[in-house]
From Swiss-Prot:
The keyword Calcium does not apply. One of its GO terms (molecular function) is nicotinate-nucleotide adenylyltransferase activity. It is an enzyme of class 2 (transferase). It catalyses: nicotinate beta-D-ribonucleotide + ATP + H(+) = deamido-NAD(+) + diphosphate. Pathway: Cofactor biosynthesis; NAD(+) biosynthesis; deamido-NAD(+) from nicotinate D-ribonucleotide: step 1/1. This is Probable nicotinate-nucleotide adenylyltransferase. NCBIfam families: cyt_tran_rel, nicotinate (nicotinamide) nucleotide adenylyltransferase, PRK00071.1-3. It comes from the Bacteria. Its EC number is 2.7.7.18. One of its GO terms (biological process) is NAD biosynthetic process. Keywords: ATP-binding, NAD, Nucleotide-binding, Nucleotidyltransferase, Pyridine nucleotide biosynthesis, Transferase. InterPro entries: Cyt_trans-like (IPR004821), NadD/NMNAT (IPR005248), Rossmann-like_a/b/a_fold (IPR014729). Catalyzes the reversible adenylation of nicotinate mononucleotide (NaMN) to nicotinic acid adenine dinucleotide (NaAD).
Amino acid sequence: MRIGILGGTFNPIHNAHLRIAEEVRDRLDLERVMFVPAASPPHKLLAGELSFEVRYEMVRLAIADNPFFTISDIEGKRGGTSYSIHTLQELHLAYPADEFFFIIGSDSFLDIGSWKEYAAIFNLCNIVVVSRPGAVADPLDKALPVAIADRFCYHAAEKRLTHSSGHSVYSIAGTLLDISSSEIRTLTRQGRSIRYLLPATVEQYIKEQRIYNDGR
């Protein structure tokens, strides 16, 4: 099975996350996209103390009506810092017959050289680099860390890199939905509308549980 992996804090999940997942699934003919909420991401401080369980529930509600989307609590169960390499290793062991497509933003790909055991990630999965709204993405071969650049071959016409392991790095320009989780948190605290920025089920959950109203 061809499975996309989309990780994040999802604090909260919103329509841009969902659209990215849908576009990657459609363009690369993926059979599933697995959302993986982070327990404690190494490159981002969580806003306030919003628990993994609450963020997990918001993702679950957001994807409930899409049969191609699923959710994993693998990072919540593991605890500690949520390193991508550990998550991908666990998934690879649990589903050895499946092919994974790790979905990340272009800004994250530019910073991948700072990730824990980053070189090993390319041995475990394909990577799908999605351009952020308004961003001008560098060609994939220019964004690679120098230390591993010689392990790749760049196919300019396809905007794709192939790794010595046989995996690929794809570049996809996503639909320009300029929505951010921080914006949603701010609007909620101000008592303003967040309608159409995220699924109605998540909006209702945020209101009922008074999430973000206490500064979280």
